[in-house]
Amino acid sequence: MKKVIVYIDGSNFYFSVKSRFNVKLDIEKFCAKLTKDKNLACIKYYIAPIDQFSNPNMYAKQQSFFDNLREIKNLQIIFGRLEKRKKDGEEYYVEKATDVNLALDLVLDAQSNSYDEAYLISNDGDFSGAVKASVERFNKKIVYVAIGNKKSISYHLKNVSSKTLNIDEKFISDLKIE
């Protein structure tokens, strides 16, 4: 049975699902449905935590979300960070290290033979180099899980992945959280 790891770009996943379907999904059931008859070894969820002092309400909601994630068997949360920036007097945050962590794990896990097949849940074309290396150098099957409309789906990921799986309303119909 093929050993599978699911890699989730958390922020990208959240905003893609929200903009496309305007729902919250049960991540455990979503990953199980994606990988159905395969050996799901691990789910890796990459995210940058919100600073508790900059936005206490969002921080509390995110911590509750993390607590729910920690209940999922074989799920690892890999944290990046948020860096505060200022432009034209306005403060905003930029997510750092999450994409690099995911790309590194995808390639290093391929090299160490931790998976036969990986599912990448992100529309970020910056992952195309890591996907290409995993497919070509380590002979791994990488499934690009595309969530969104045709504009948001990454042409670069589609080109280098072994397979593209477009998520539609029908796929998620039984995975919604109220």
Regions found by a protein language model. Name each.
Residues E71, Q76-E178:
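Nuclease catalytic cores that cleave nucleic-acid phosphodiester bonds
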